[in-house]
C-alpha cells in the first residue's frame, strides 16, 4: 500500500491529496493523452531540514518538452517553481517520489489535441527501493518497444506505457523481476521503465537515442559520470546475445536508481560488478550532495 504525501497541486492550487479528484469522463483517461515526470526527493544526510532533488532542472525541461507534444505550453521554470513549493508544503522527512502530470482535462470523447483543455497536477508518495538493490532477473519480452515514428518516445507519454505494462506483467507472471524490450530491429533497447547498460571488456555500453529509448536523465548522468571516471563508454545497438555473456549489466532510472541485473532468461551474470559498483557509489554520493564537483546537479529545498 502506497503512502501518499498529504498535499497535492491540482487545478492551480495546493490542497489535500484526497480532495484532488477528476471525472470519469476526463479525456486523458480514455485516450492516454498525458505526459508525466518522476523525480526523487531525499532528506539531506548533512541537514535533515533540507530536501535534495536530483537534476530538477532537467526533469522540468523534459516535462515541458513533453507538454509540447500535447500542444500545451508549460514552461520548465513554472514546473520547477510548483515542485519546489510542493516539497515545502509537504514537509517530508523521508525519501519520496514526486509525480508531475500533464493531461487533457476536458470531459468528453474524440481523440484530439486541438481545441481541448489541458491541466497539470503534482502528487507524491513515500518510496524506498523500487527494485531490489541486490539485483534483478530479467525476461526478454515478447512485446516490442514502439518505434519513434509511431509514438513520441523521448518523453513519458502516458498512453505509450501500455506496452511497458504488458511486458512487466508477462515477466513477473513467468517468474522474473523485470522485462527487457527489443525494438523493431530486434535490438535490446530498455526495460519496462528503465534504461539499460551493459559492461563488456571494461567498456560501458548502452543503446543510443536512435534505438527508440527514453531520454533518461539518470542515463545521461551515468554517461557523464562514467567518462569523468575514465570508463570507456559507447552508445550503440545492443544484441540480445550480448546480454547472455555480459560481464555486468544494470538498469537505470529515477525510481530504480542503479539496479544490477543478475540473470537474463536462464543465463546467470557474474556476481562481481566492479564498474557498476563504482558508478553506483559515486552517483549515491552525488545525489546526497557529498561531491562538490557535481553540486549543480542537486537542488536544495529548505524546509524551514
Where is each model-derived feature located?
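Phosphate/pyrophosphate-binding loops at sites that engage ATP/ADP/AMP, CoA/4′-phosphopantetheine
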Residues: 86-91
